[in-house]
Amino acid sequence: MSFVIPSLKLSISSTLTCALVLFTSISGHAQSSSKLDKIVIAGWGKPITEITNLLVEEDKGFFKSKSIEMTIIPGAGGADAIRNLLSGQADVAFTDPASFFTAIDKGEKLRAIYDIYPQNIFNLVSLKSQNITKPSDLKGKRIGVYSLASGTRQNLQILLHQAGLTEADVTIVVTGLLNFLPLMQGQVDATAATDTGLLVGKQKGLGDVNVMEVKNYVNISSDFFVVREETYQQKKDVLKRFLQAYQDSAEWMIRSPQEAAKLAVKFALDGQNESANLEVIKLRNATSVSAMTQQKGLGAFDMGLIQKGVNAYKGFGLIQRDIKVADVISQDLLPGKK
């Protein structure tokens, strides 16, 4: 599996090569691994520890075992992943629901096929000294976001909406992925982040903080796998195998967090500390499961909860149209579906 970073020209591993002919049972028929179907994932970020299950393909071969050659293109947020998908650079986007539904609202023909993280991982963090404890306290504040195309920005909008505020009532500061350094240096009053980002920030010396978790307001999922409608219609067999491989990799990381933490040292850009990796992986494993996945398996969507989230998006102006999630989310490609 290659991790293509055009700007840095960094390769995490060598491209998969054809192996001996092996046959694996996929949906009742054999697939030859001597002929690999290529799937390019448009990522929301860089090759970091929380996606270790995708980074270990060279060692574990989850995708190759399903006759898939998997490559990842990094991005600068979920909207960036959608852009890379729409431009044809990728087959699948790893993106947040807000970016997905915003694209749908604009008329793009897309379909979500797997709920990667059914728990909302986003939060807003501020130093205790700022006394920011509720959304209304954000008025007039400088707030950091990973990028203007990121889920941190969209989820900040959810919090602002709770207090009847908009982005016009605050100052948005783009901080990049290391968004806790500007907070610690006083360049921003608060920063929109994720659970793993907060964990890493604390490991790097972030002091006492107040945390507002978005899930306490709208617990919509954090990330989906999204494809173009034409890809969904034309490549269902390949996508089924891709989702089975991803589910296998996610189940492995849940089952073997210590092994994943060790491999992250080798494959993740931020994975130098194995014990820190383990904490990140445990957090991400916890957000991969929900009451719905307990019943129907990893990747299953809670359609009712997601519809509530979409209605909230319309309520604060992120989208303009009424969107029925059943029209743009399909579960027929999930592992176990016929």
Regions found by a protein language model. Give the residues of each.
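Short linear loop/turn motifs
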Residues: T71, N277-A286, I323-P335
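Short, low-complexity disordered leader/linker segments with a strong preference
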Residues: M1-K38, K337-K338
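Short, glycine-/small- and polar/acidic-enriched structural segments
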Residues: S32-Q185, D189-D195, L206, V211-M212, ...
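Pocket-lining segment of extracytoplasmic ligand-binding domains
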Residues: A98, L178-N273
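Secondary-structure end/capping motifs
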Residues: Q234-L318
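Conserved C-terminal helix/tail region of periplasmic/extracytoplasmic solute-binding proteins
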Residues: I306-K338
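Predominant activation on well-ordered alpha-helical scaffold segments within soluble catalytic domains
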Residues: L55, F101, Q157, L199-K202, ...
